[in-house]
Swiss-Prot record:
PANTHER family: PHOSPHOENOLPYRUVATE DIKINASE-RELATED, PYRUVATE, PHOSPHATE DIKINASE 1, CHLOROPLASTIC. It is found in: Plastid, Chloroplast; Cytoplasm. It catalyses: pyruvate + phosphate + ATP = phosphoenolpyruvate + AMP + diphosphate + H(+). Its EC number is 2.7.9.1. Residues 1-77 form a transit peptide. The gene is PPDK. Homotetramer. The N-terminal domain contains the ATP/Pi binding site, the central domain the pyrophosphate/phosphate carrier histidine, and the C-terminal domain the pyruvate binding site. This is Pyruvate, phosphate dikinase, chloroplastic.
Length: 953
């Protein structure tokens, strides 16, 4: 039975109201009236408010909250509104307002609406942050009045006032962008304390708690708002602990903490030449400014750059009444995931600290206990927490990351957001949630990011049992996978080493948001402090970066650039291996092995394959590459570069050099006859590996000088003189003639085959002989021959004539005729412009986007590094065009050539075979243009398969 209540033009409906006891029903109706009278509320979800207890629900025969609200009038616009309140069963926002309220603010509003215990607060919108930046980094007109009005609501709800010693209200001020950026922006806790307020708080809640909160606030406010290094406060704390002969800050007495507060206040004067601001309203204004400022901090900008986060207006600011986990042994704080973010296992995964505040867990300041300890010491709060987790998973239909505090045995929910997860975790969670009926396969495809698959394709240790004797310490397995590198102790060094091509293991006592660049550059991360939900762990998991945290056995000395494990000393530059799955720290350079595809991943990829339209092929030059590609789900070979086969042995490269030195076609044919068996053998292996799938083989493309060594030629010249009978002077002269001013636009591609038809003849003969041989062995062969660097239809016509002539001869000699295709690479802009002419000659087009990008931009791929970073930093380019397809320029050539080619030849097959074939946003563009396939490296095939599916769903 459905009951309804009409209030000021909005019809509120609850599917369960008639089932509730009468007194609960009356209470809810009163709440709903108050909700609908609240000004500018966009819409409200009528769900069980926080004040309806679970026992009342259970006594009515109901499960925890699932009531719904269907608004029948259009929602009130929130375009002009900049401050939104929430708490105690009501809110002015909802989870769909992330772009305006940030992820944290939207989810606080949502948790409030569904009846969870959320401390009242207000969210200042991201639009206000944008206005702040545009207003010269000062609060825009009228905003402080709106904040004050929101604060009045919080004070009324909490029956407390900011700055009132008799009824003290303390606040947290936190950032929250629309996209999660763990640790990148600022937080201030316990705001509102001064000497008078702390005395009042001490009278109500105890002196130790009050002064512990005060010293934390002085530290955090000083660092975040005043720019005082945290280390200056930490020095005072460590000095006092040493004087008292204690190890934990929890062992400090109230008198100790009171003394520490005075020392902290002196830090302000020593570091800034000014006193700590005691006016709570001024503290709040400064804190809001600091959070807005942190949006534009170097670490936040770097994080957004690394993760390609663009288009956001700014960060929201969440001002919330404080609840305290540091009020003794009946209080605590924790962070959890509703499923294991590393493995995906359906089990609560998190950490808990008794008598602590949330930043102690998240910042890795103290190494916390496993969440299971909470069940033992606070069973009622733990039971409610488990129920809340189930409610949130059902509501959001996703794995959630939750922060909570227990204050004197009462649970408070401080944050929920979609949890960051590893590749392994993402795939298992997606598959399990489909099996549980929470989501469908299309939603599952959207849930797994292409970066997640990239992580799954990273190597693991070849033989974990082989290194057991080299394990010197074990920390927490914070982010799975394996990492091998040389030890470094600063983020700056890690970035420098990475730029030099060195593999670094970043070793820190604990990481901070300032380390984000070095963390991204490092192969792996090792920290002495911090738990599974510390900054290092969360950021590393988000990137699929191997991380071992909370390794209490190590002592890090940044000044000496060493760390010690007992008597053992590990220096900068020493090789170290990390197992992020087990937490093992291993001396030396351990061997890595390629990863294997799990059953969950196979199931997930089958859903992606059913959804996508675009075929995914691979660039593979050897039988092993082809086998890897097939195992990774490739539907054929889109590019086999024949020149790579020439470097496989000394005999092959010698034969190539003889061919290059040849003066007459006859001499050249003798050398090519030596190469033919090698090429035929390689093609046979590739055809065998790709049985039943197309194999596109590109004829010789690079300039001939690339097959000659650089530097000292004397040894090679002498060798060639013996092999060819030419004099040294003749060989030097030949080499000199081969050198070009601009070789990438010189004597290469089809120009070689036209100038030396015998070169094309040899390669094509090897292809067709291998194809017939494999066919005779029962292998289904689908050969496709690709002519490179065509700029005119006449060039392609010439090479097709040579190819068809050789094919006819081989088929006649071997008594077998096969179907085959001949096509071309479109990599010269002119070819794209006259694609209708070239399309009449070709069976297929394959866009060589690497060269097409070079020639369209006029950038040399080998030299672009000299200015590319400047262009990216100044916004001249948004992306590296050799990584992400330039849709406005190069992309338009691809679109035009596809349309023109198909107009001339409706059966024309069209694909791409450049590096862009494995880049997700480029794959989306190629699908939109209507290409038939993309081809990428074997290890990126699963990524391209998923990207192609995500375009459709």
């Amino acid at each position: 039975m459905m009951s309804s209540l009409s209030v000021e033009g909005m019809l509120l409906k609850s599917a369960r109201e008639s089932c509730l006891p009468a007194r609960v029903n009356q209470r809810r109706n009163g709440d709903l009236r108050r909700l609908n009278h609240h000004r500018q509320s966009s819409f409200v979800r009528c769900l069980t408010p926080a004040r309806v207890s679970r026992p009342e629900l259970r006594s009515s025969g109901l499960t925890p909250p699932r009531a719904v609200l269907n608004p029948v009038s259009p929602p009130v616009t929130t375009a002009k509104k900049r401050v939104f309140t929430f708490g105690k069963g009501r809110s002015e926002g909802n989870r769909d307002m992330k772009s305006l309220l940030g992820g944290k603010g939207a989810n606080l509003a949502e948790m409030s609406s569904i009846g969870l215990s959320v401390p009242p607060g207000l969210t200042i919108s991201t639009e206000a942050c944008e206005e702040y930046q545009q207003n010269g980094k000062s609060l825009p007109p009228g905003l402080w009045d709106e904040i004050s009005e929101g604060l009045d609501y919080v004070q009324k709800e909490m029956s407390a006032s900011l700055g009132d010693p008799s009824k003290p209200l303390l606040l947290s001020v936190r950032s929250g962008a629309a996209i999660s950026m763990p640790g990148m922006m600022d937080t201030v806790l316990n705001l509102g304390l001064n000497d008078e307020v702390v005395a009042g708080l001490a009278g109500k809640s105890g002196a130790r708690f009050a002064y512990d909160s005060y010293r934390r606030f002085l530290d955090m406010f000083g660092n975040v708002v005043m720019g005082i290094p945290h280390s200056l406060f930490d020095e005072k704390l460590e000095q006092m602990k040493a004087e008292k002969g204690i190890h934990l800050d929890t062992d400090l007495t109230a008198a100790d903490l009171k003394d520490l507060v005075e020392k902290y206040k002196n830090v302000y004067v020593e570091a800034k030449g000014e006193k700590f601001p005691t006016d709570p309203k001024k503290q709040l204004e400064l804190a809001v400014n600091a959070v807005f400022d942190s949006w534009d901090s170097p670490r936040a900008n770097k994080y957004r750059s690394i993760n390609q986060i663009t288009g956001l207006k700014g960060t929201a600011v969440n001002i919330q009444s404080m609840v305290f986990g540091n009020m003794g042994n009946t209080s605590g704080t924790g962070v959890l995931f509703t499923r294991n973010p590393s493995t995906g296992e359906k089990k609560l995964y998190g950490e808990f600290l008794i008598n602590a505040q949330g930043e102690d867990v998240v910042a890795g300041i103290r190494t916390p206990e496993d969440l299971g300890t909470m069940e033992t010491c606070m069973p009622e709060a733990y039971k409610e927490l488990v129920e809340n987790c189930e409610i949130l998973e059902r509501h959001y239909k996703d794995m959630m990351d939750i922060e909570f505090t227990v204050q004197e045995n009462r649970l408070w929910m401080l944050q929920c957001r979609t949890g960051k997860r590893t590749g392994k975790g993402a795939v298992r969670i997606a598959v399990d949630m489909v099996n549980e009926g929470l989501i469908d396969t299309r939603t599952a495809i959207k849930r797994v990011e292409t970066q997640h698959l990239d992580q799954l394709l990273h190597p693991q240790f070849e033989d974990p049992s082989a290194y057991k004797s080299h394990v010197v310490a074990t920390g927490l397995p914070a982010s799975p996978g394996a990492a091998v590198g040389q030890v470094c102790f600063s983020a700056e060094d890690a970035e420098t080493w990475h730029a030099q091509g060195k593999s670094a293991i970043l070793v820190r006592t604990e990481t901070s948001p300032e380390d984000v660049g070095g963390m991204h550059a490092a192969a792996g991360i090792l920290t002495a402090r911090g738990g599974m939900t510390s900054h290092a762990a969360v950021v590393a998991r988000g990137w699929g970066k191997c991380c071992v945290s909370g390794c209490a056995d190590i002592r890090v000395n940044d000044d000496m650039k060493i760390f010690t494990i007992g008597d053992r000393v590990i220096k900068e530059g020493d090789w170290l291996s990390l197992n992020g799955t087990t937490g093992e720290v291993i001396l030396g350079k351990q061997l890595l092995a390629p990863p294997a595809m799990s059953n969950d991943l196979e199931i997930f990829m089958s859903w992606a394959d059913q959804a996508r339209r675009l075929k995914v092929m691979a660039n593979a030059d050897t039988p092993n590459d082809a086998l890897t590609a097939r195992n990774n789900g490739a539907q054929g070979i889109g590019l086999c570069r024949t020149e790579h086969m020439f470097f496989a042995s000394d005999e092959r490269i010698k034969a190539v050099r003889k061919m290059i030195m040849a003066v007459t076609p006859e001499q050249r044919k003798v050398a090519l006859d030596l190469l033919l068996p090698y090429q035929r053998s390689d093609f046979e292996g590739i055809f065998r590996a790709m049985d039943g799938l197309p194999v596109t083989i590109r004829l010789l493309d690079p300039p001939l000088h690339e097959f000659l060594p650089e530097g000292d030629l004397e040894h090679i010249v002498n060798e060639l003189a013996v092999d060819t009978g030419m004099s040294a002077d003749e060989i030097y002269s030949k080499i000199e003639n081969l050198s070009e001013v601009n070789p990438m636009l010189g004597f290469r591609g089809c120009r070689l085959g036209i100038s030396y038809p015998e070169l094309t003849e040899m390669q094509v003969r090897a292809i067709f002989q291998a194809a017939v041989s494999m066919t005779n062995q029962g292998v289904t062969v689908i050969p496709e021959i690709m002519v490179p660097l065509v700029g005119t239809p006449q060039e392609l016509r010439h090479q097709i004539s040579v190819i068809r002539g050789v094919a006819a001869n081989v088929f006649a000699e071997m008594g077998v005729t096969l179907e085959y295709k001949v096509g071309t690479m479109i990599e010269i802009p002119r070819a794209a412009l006259i694609a209708e002419e070239i399309g009449k000659e070709a069976d297929f087009f394959s866009f060589g986007t690497n060269d097409l990008t070079q020639m369209t931009f006029g950038y040399s791929r080998d030299d672009v590094g000299k200015f590319l970073q400047i262009y990216l930093a100044q916004g001249i380019l948004q992306h590296d065009p050799f990584e992400v397809i330039d849709q406005k320029g190069v992309g338009q050539l691809i679109k035009m050539a596809t349309e023109k080619g198909r107009a001339a030849n409706p059966s024309l097959k069209v694909g791409i075979c450049g590096e862009h074939g494995g880049e997700p946003s480029s794959v989306a563009f190629f699908d939109g243009v209507g290409l038939d396939y993309v081809s990428c490296s074997p290890f990126r095939v699963p990524i391209a398969r998923l990207a192609a599916a995500q375009v459709i769903v």
